[in-house]
Amino acid sequence: MLQDESSRSLPRSALIRRRLSLFLQSHALMYSFLWSESAKKSLLNEVFSALLGYDHTLWNTLLPERPTIDASFLLRRAQGHSEGDEYRHGTCESKCGHIFRKGEVFYRCKTCSVDSNSALCVKCFRATSHKDHETSFTVSAGSGGCCDCGNAAAWIGDVSCKIHSHEEDATISNDMIDEIPEKLENSIQTTIDCVLDFVLDVFSCSPENLKKMPTLESILQDEKTSRLSENKYGDIDDSCNMYSLVLWNDEKHSFKQFYEQITTALELPNNVFGKKMANIINDIGRACIVTETNIKELLKIGQKLAQINLAVSIRSMRDIFREESCAVLLEWLADIAGSSICGKRNYFSSVICKELVRPWNCGLHNSDLTFRLSLRSLALPEIVAIDSPDIFLNEDHINSSGPSDTSSHMLETDESSIHSRHWYPSNSLPDVLSYASRVRFDYFFLYDLKLWKSLRYKLQELYLGYFITQPGFKEIMGARIAISYRRLAELFLLLDREPEHSVIFFSMQIFTVADVAKLLVTEYDFLTTINATLYTFFTYKKLNTPNYVDQHAMIRTDSAAFHSRRYIHIFHHIQFMLSIPCVAEIVREDLKFLKQYADFFNLFQGMCPYTRAVSQHVEWENDSWMYVLNVSLQVAKLCRHVGNVFMELNTNKLANAINYLISLILYPKARNESWTNTESLTTGITVDERGNSKLIEYDIALQPVSFHHPLHWLLVYLLSFYVERDNYKLLWTQLDLLAVTDHPLRVCAWLSQMRAKLWIRNGTTLRDQAHHYRNLSFHEYTFDLDVLLLQLTLTYGDPDAILPSFISRFQLEDQMYGRFFVPHKHYDVSQVTIMMEEFLLLLISIVCNTAVLDHWDITRRIEYGIAHILCFRPLPYSEITKRTCEHLLEHKQFESTLKKVATFRNAEGINDSGSFTLKDEYFDYVDPFNIHYSRNQREEAENILRRRYSKQHSKHLESVVYEEYHPILHSNITIPILQSDSFVGILWHTIVYAYIYPYDQGKLEGLVNTALHACLLVLMSEKGSEPIFSKKICENRFPVVEGLQEYCNSPDVTLFSVLCQMKNHRNFVYVKEKISLIMKILKSEVPLLYEPVYAETLSISSSKIVQSLSDAEQQEQHLAKVRMAKERQARIMEQFRMQQNKFLENHALFEASDCEMDEADEFSVTSSVSTKLFLDPPIDTCLLCQEELKDKRPYGTLVFVLRSSVLRLFPADDANYVSEVLDIPDSLDHEIQERPFGLAGKRKKVLDSTEAYDYDNYYYEKKGNELHQLKDSFNGFPPDQLDRGLHATGCGHFMHIDCFKNHIATVTLATRANPYRNHPHNLSMKEFLCPLCKALCNTIFPILWRPKEEINFQEAGVLTAPLKNWLVSKTFSFNKDLNQQLLDIETSPSEHTQSYNLNLLDVLQHTLRDSLKDIYTLNTGADNSSDNVEENADNLFQSSVLDHVHFKSVVNNEVPADERLAISDDIFELYRRLDDVIDLNSSLYSDDFIPVNGKLHNVVKLFSYSLCQVEASTRGHIKCSSIPADIWVHNLGKNQQVFLRILSESIKTYTLLCAHDSQKRIGGSIQEFEFISFCQQKRIFGRLLPSLDSPVTKSITDDRVEPLLVKDTFREFAEASVSGLLSCDESFHYLTQLYYTADIVRNLWILLSQRNSLLKCMESVEFEAFDYEQLKGFEHLVIQIWKSLRVDGAGLINFDCCTEDDLNNPHLLFTLYKLLERFSLIFLRKCALLWYCRYGVSFETQPNLNFQNSELSRLQTKMHIPGVIELSNHLCLTASSTEWSLIKHWCNFFTETGPLCDFPRAYYPGIYELVSLPYELDKVFELLLARRCSKCLTEPMEPAICLFCGKLLCFQSHCCSFNGIGECNLHMQQCASDIGIFLIVKKCAILYLNPPVGSFSVAPFLDAYGETDLGLRRGRSQYLSQKRYDETVRTMWLNGSIPSYIARQLDANPDTGGWETL
C-alpha cells in the first residue's frame, strides 16, 4: 500500500494499524463479498505480514525460511507441532491440558479428586494408578473441559502420570532463546490489537436473538449500523445491496427436518442441496442458504423455514463475509497462541491475553448509536473492575476511554426501596464502575451467542488451551466472568440454541477453582450474583441492576422458567461454590448469605397448594406439576448444600441463624394480593377454654395444603447440627417449635389421607406427586426432613403437650378420646382405620429412627440403609444404588461399607448379574416398620425375621414373635415419647377401637399388629431399666367407652385388661403370640402389679369372657395335641408316598410291554423290544390347533432358509493362518479353555498387555498410518475369504400343513393391515414368525417318510471288501484306460438306453414309494398313464444337452398303472415354496453372492452348506457331559439332531420328486438331475454308473464338468449323497474312503502351491520325536502330487510352488503331514455328521473309547478310515492300484480343465472367531482416540467396530450415509453381506443388522460388580466377559440365529423403524 505524505510522519505501529485496518475493511469488496479459499489465503498472508511489520526478513524468527501460505497453512504445524503433543515425550509438559471433544470419554476418580470437577483424559487415566479406587467415566457432551493431569489443585495427593511425570527437561535452553526485536514486539502487539477490535466491531452488530424473524426495516437498519468507521479504518465503508439468508443449527430439529424444510422453502426438485446444507449446518453451525438482492424474496423463504421454528437470519453479504473473516482470524489467533517466536513458547498467548484485558475501541460508522444498541442487549453493568496489580494491567488500561453509558448503572429510587440490605454489595467493595471499564474479554463472553457452533468451540479451546495456563490470567478470567455472569446466565437460560456449547460451561471450569472462587466471592460478591440470577429468573423480573432483587416478586409456576431444564446448571454452580471449603467458610460467617437463600427459598414456600375436591372429580389435569416438582427437587437439594455449610458454625451464631429462620416461618412476609395460597400464613398457637395451648384450627381436608416448604427443610438441617453440640441450649419455647412443626405435620397427615383415598377426586396427578414425594429421589430431601422435624419437636418437647396437636392434625380426636361411634365429618369407617394405622406408623418411625439424635457417623448410616435394602433378597449393585439415598451414595465410604455389610457373588451364567447378599449379623439393623416400607414389604420383612429367629432358636415359625429377639430401638433418647401418658392413651384407644368396633376384623389386622408392635417396642427397650411403661399398662385407667360395656363391668379399665380379653378372642388369634409375650414381659417386669390386675380383669369381665380366660390353658393344651396329630399324619403320608413310588417302579415294565405291543401292530415290528428309529414320532402338538401330530393329517416342521457367509476359506498365502492350523488342538469335541483361540487369542494378549500411552506415534496426520494402526489394533478375518451360501435352520416346532396355510394367510392379512409398522418379517421374502418361539421362518418341511430304524454301524459290520472290488462291481473294470472305457461306452449307446430308462425309473419310483407314508401317496388309474416328461424342460439344459439329444418319455407303458405313484398336491406345493424361498435368497445378491443355478443345484448346495456350518459352529465349544458322547454329533441338541435328519430326508425327497413323472412339477427336473448326477459321477469315478448312461448324459462334454479338485470334497460328497449317488446308500463307507482320499490329494495340492507360507510356519513348528521312516509312503504321495502340478500345465504352475529341494526336507514333510492331519480331522467330523443325518448311523451304542486319544484317532477307529500315514503307505505299496488310477484321473482332469476354473480353495479348518476385544473397555476408548473414519476422514462421534473384520465406522451418522443407508449397512454389504455385527463402543452395545432391520443387545462387557451397562449410563469401567462374548454373540452368529433375534426384538417393540427407534 502506498503511503501519502501525511502518513510518513506516523509511527511504525500506526502505519501497520492503518494498513491492516484498511485491508480488513476493503477485503470483502475485493472478492465481491463472496467468501472463498482465495479470500482466506489473502487474509492469512496479510495478517502474517502485519504480524512481522510487513518485513518478510523477520520470518526467521518463526521459521527457518519463509513459507508459502495457502488457505490451510498453520504456523504451529509448520513449526513441527501436531495433534497429540500433550502426550508425546519431548514435547509434552508437566500438565496435560487436553481439551475434551464432543463424544470423547473422560474419567473421574472420587478417591483422588478434590471435587467432581476434576477429570482425566483417557490416556492420562490409563497412565495413572487407580487400583481399587472409585472411578467413573463420562462421554463428553461437547460443553468444554480439559484434562486436569498435572494440576495439583484438582487432586488430594500426587497423581503420578507416566506420560507427564517424566524426568526429561522439556524447557528450552537459554542459548536457543533469542531476544525479540522491539519493532517486532510492537508489530505483534499492534496486529493483535487491530484484529481483536475488528472482530468485536463485526460481531457487535451480529444478531443475537434469532427467535424473532427479521423485517425489511431491521435488515436495512442492520446494514447501515454495521458499516465500519472511516476514522478508524481509513476509508468510507460503502453500502451492500446483496443479502444472504443464513440458517442456524439448533438442538431441537433433526437432520431430516432441516434438509426437507430447505427443499420445501427453495422449491427444489430433490433433497441433494438440502442434505448438503444440512451437513454444513451440522458440522459448522450455520450455512448461507440463498443470496439475493430482493430482500422480500429472502423474507418469504425465511418465513417458510421458520414454520418449524428454524433459526434464520438475513444480513448483507458484506457482513457475512466479514463474519467468516473473523472466524479465520480467531483460528489464526489460536494458531499463533500455540506457536513460538525466537524460541519463546508462550509469547503470543501472553500478548493476546494482555490485549484481551484492554478496552475495546469501537470502530463502527455510527459508533455511539451502534454501541448503545449493543449495550441495550447487555443491559447489565459489572460489579467492580479489576483493581489489583497484575502483569496484564497497566496505566493504559486504567485510563483508557471507550463508549459508555454512565447512567445505566444508577439505581432507581423505586427499585432500591424494595431491596433488603443483604442483597447489596458489602461496604468493602469498591463503587460500581461504568461501562468504560469493560474490556475486550467481556465482549467475547457476551457475544458468545452471536457465534456459531464451530467458532464457539474454537474460542473455548483457545481459553482452555492457552489462556488458562498463563500465570495470573485464570484469576482475571474469573473476575471477568463474575462481572458478566448475570448476562451470560440470562442468555443461556432463555436464548441459547445450542446450550451444550455455551461459554457458561467453560466459566464453571474457572470459578470452581478454590483460589479463584475465594477471590470472586470476597472481592466481587460473585455468590450474590449467582443467587440474584436464580432469584430473578424464577420471578421473571428483569432489572437493570446486577445483584438487587425484588423481594415482593412472586414465582409463576406456569412460566417458561419452570418448563426449562437449564436452570439445573445454575443450581449446580451454587452447589459447586458452596462445596469449596474456603467459600463455605465465608458463607457461614456472613449472615447475609443465609438471608439471601432464605429469600430465595421463601419464593417456593407453600407453592402450588391443593384443596380437596369434595363433591366432584377434577375434570382437567395439566402437567405443570411435573415441572414444579423438578424445581422443588433442585430447591430441596440446594437446601441440603446450604445447610451443610453451617455444620461447623459457632454454636451461638448457629442459634442466631435458627432464630432467623423460625421468625421467618412464624411471621412470614406479606404476599402480593395475587398470591392465592394462604397456608403459609395460617400458623400459630391458640389457647383453648381450659388454658391449654395448641395449634390453630386447620382442616387440611378443606383448606389449602402444599408439599413445598423449603424454609422448614433448611431449618431442619440447622436444628440437627445444633442439637449435636455438647453445649447447646434450647432457646426456643415448646410452643414455637410446635408452631414451626405445623406445616410438615400437615404434609404427613395429608399423605396419610391420600393413602386412605380421601383425595381420590383430585385425580391422578396429586397421587403421582404424593408418590414422588415419598419416593427415593425425593424423600431424603423432603419427607425425611418433615419426619425429623417432628422427631426433634417431640424429643425436646413435652410429648403429653405435643401429641394432642398431632392427633388434631390427623383429625382423630373422636377416636383418641373414645367417641368411636360419632360419625367422622370426612372419613368413613375404613378410612378411620387407615388413618389410625398411619398415625401409629408415623409415631413408631419417629421413635425408632434416631440416627440424627444419636449422632450416627456416616458409616453407620450407610450400613443401616443397605441393611433395609438387602434384607429381602440379594441385589445387584445398580439396584442397590437406585434404592440408596443420594448423600450416602456420593460418600467415599459407600463402596467400602457395602463390601463390609454384604457378601458379593460374581455373575455365573451368561444372563446373570453379580449380586450382594446381606451378612447375617446386619439383619439386626432391619426395622420392618421402616416408614419407607410398603405394607407388603413390612409383612415380608417380618416373615424374614421370624424365619431367621425360628432357625436360631429352634422354635416353630407360628410361635415366633421376632420383637422378643430383634433389637429395634438402638437408643433411649426417644423412649420418653413412648412412656408418656398420651402415648399410652393412644394405644388404649387404638386397641379398644379394634376390639369393640363392629367392623370386619380382617381389615383391622394391620392396625392391631402396629399397636402391639409399639407396645413390644417400649417393653423390650425398658428391660434392665425402670418399667415405666409396664406400670402404666397396668395402672393407667381409662373410662369404659360405649361398646366396651358388654365386655367389662367396671367404669374404667386398664390396657392390661383389654389385652387379656383379646388374647383368647377368636377374632384375634393372629396376635395371640404377641399378646402372650406382652403378658410374659409384664409378669416378669412388674410381678407385684401383674397378679392383682389379672385378678381384677377376671372380676370385671363378663361371664363369657371369664369363661374364655379360665379355659385358656386347656385350649393351649388342645392346640398342642392337634399340632402333634398333624405332624404324625404328615409322616404317615410321606411313608405312603414312598411305598407308592416303589410299587410303580416295580410294575412299570408291564405298561411298557403293553405299549410296545400296540406299536408292533401299527408298525409291524415283531420284536417286543423297542428299536430306536431314524426319526422318532413327535410328541408335541400342533402350534395352532393344539391337536396331536399323527399320520391322519399331514404335518411338518418350521424352517428358515437364509443367506449365510459364515464359512471361511483358508488364507493359505498367509503364514499366520497356516501356523494357526498347526496349533489346532487334537480334539475339537471338548471345550477349548484358551479363549479366544489362535490368532484372535494372540491379538487379545497384545491388546491387553500393551499400554497405548507408550506410543509416541499415537496421533497421525496421514490417513494410511491411521488405518494401519487401527488394523493392527482390531484385526479380523479377511472379508474376501468368505464363502457365501444358503443355510437352513429350524426352531424345532411342528404344525399341520393345513394349519400352516391358515397361519400364512393370517400373517399376510395382519401385516398388510398395519403398513406403518416396522414388521419383524418380510412378506416379500415369504418370512413369518413361529407362533410359539417367535423365531423367523420362511417355509415348512413336511414329514412324509415311513419309520425306519437307525443303522447300528458296529452291529451291521464294516464292509471289508477292498475298494477296488467295490469299484469294479459298482462301475467298471479298471484294466483298460479310463478314457478308452468311456470311448467304448460312447460307441455303443443303444445297448444302454432302454435298460437305463427302465432301471432309473424303477430305482427312483421304488425309493420314493418306500420312503413316503401312505397318506401322501395313492395308486393311480389309466387316466394318468399318459403323463410324460416334457421335451422342452429346464432352460439351463435346453442349450447344453437337449440341443444334441432328443429325449423321449421315460415312462414305460408296459408298467402296470396301479404300480405307478401319485403324490399329494400339498407336497408339491410345499416344495415349490422351498423353490421360491431359495430363489429369493439366491437372487438377492445374484451378482456377487450365489450364482443362479438350477433349482436342484441350489437345493443340494443348501444341504451341504448347512452341514458344514453346523460342524464349524461346534469346533472346540461342545461341553461334554459327565459321560462323553461316542462322537461329537451326539453332543448336539436333540432338536438340532432331529432337524438335520429332517433336512436330509427333505432334500433327498426333493431330488426324487424332480425325477417323478407328474404334471405337478417342482422347480427341479429329471434333466437337471441327470446333469448333476453325470457331473458328480464323472468327477469322482471318471465315468458314469451304468444306470445313468443315457443319450442325455452322453451329450454332455467334459468342459462342462468342474474337476473334483476345484470343489470342496466334503460338499461334493454331501451333495452327491442326496442326488447323483442315491443308488449307493448301502456303500456309504466306500464313498467316504474315496472322498477322504480325494480330500487329502486336494489339500496337498493347495499346500504345495504355497511355498512361502510353508517355509515361514515351518520355522515355528516344534518337531517332536518322530520316525521319519514312517513318512516314506507319505513322501511318495507328496512327490506324485507335486509332479502332477508340473505336468502339462504350464499355465497352472504357481510361482510359489514348492521346489524339489523343498520336498527333500523332512521338516517340510512333517509340517505337511501335521497340516493334513488337521484337515483330515475336519473332513471326518463332517463325514460323521453326514453319516448320522443322511445314512442314519448311530454311534451311541458303541463302547466308549479311550478319550485320552485324539479325536482324529477316535474318528478313524469308529469309522474304519485309515490315517494319512496308513493311506500313504497303502498307496505306496500298490503303485498300480485302482486308487492311484483315480488319483491320476483327478489330477489330470484338473490340469486339463484347470485354466477354465478357479484355483482350488480349502475351507478354514480352525476355530471360527470374531474380532478380539481387550479385557478393558477403557483400552478400546484409548485405542480409538483420534482415530478417523476411512470414508469421511473425521473422528466418529459414535464409533462402531465391525466384529468380522475390525474396521472402524461411523454409527448413525449422516456423514457416511449413501441414499439414506448408513455406513454400517454399507460396510456389511462389502464384508459379511448377509448380516452385520458391530460393537457400538460408547453405548457398550452390540448392533445386529439383517437388512433392512436391526436391533441392539448388551455388549459382553461387565463392570466390577458383574453388571452390564447398555448406554454406559452408570459410567463404571467395563471388563470383557469372554464367556458371554462366545455364548451370545459368537454362538448366535455361527448358528444363524441373528435374524431370529432381531425379529424377536422387533416383535416385542412395535415401532416405525429407522435410526430413531433402533
Swiss-Prot record:
- What InterPro entries does this protein's entry cite? E3_ELL-like, E3_ligase_UBR-like_C, UBR1-like, UBR1-like_winged-helix, WH_DNA-bd_sf, Znf_UBR
Entries under Pfam families matching the protein: PRT6_C, UBR1-like_wing, zf-UBR
**PANTHER family assigned to the protein according to its UniProt record, in alphabetical order:** E3 UBIQUITIN-PROTEIN LIGASE UBR1 (PTHR21497:SF24), UBIQUITIN LIGASE E3 ALPHA-RELATED (PTHR21497)
Q: In which pathway does it act?
A: Protein modification; protein ubiquitination
Instruction: Tell me the SUPFAM superfamilies matching this sequence.
Output: Winged helix' DNA-binding domain
What is the organism field in this record? Schizosaccharomyces pombe (strain 972 / ATCC 24843)
Q: Which GO terms describe its biological process?
A: negative regulation of SREBP signaling pathway; positive regulation of flocculation; proteasome-mediated ubiquitin-dependent protein catabolic process; protein ubiquitination; ubiquitin-dependent protein catabolic process via the N-end rule pathway
Q: Which UniProt keywords apply?
A: Metal-binding, Transferase, Ubl conjugation pathway, Zinc, Zinc-finger
Q: Does the keyword Zinc-finger apply?
A: yes
Q: What is this protein called?
A: E3 ubiquitin-protein ligase ubr1
MF terms in GO = ubiquitin protein ligase activity; zinc ion binding
| Record gene name | ubr1
What EC number(s) would the UniProt record show?
2.3.2.27
* ZnF segments: RING-type: 1182-1334
Starting at the broadest rank, the lineage of the source organism is:
Eukaryota, Fungi, Dikarya, Ascomycota, Taphrinomycotina
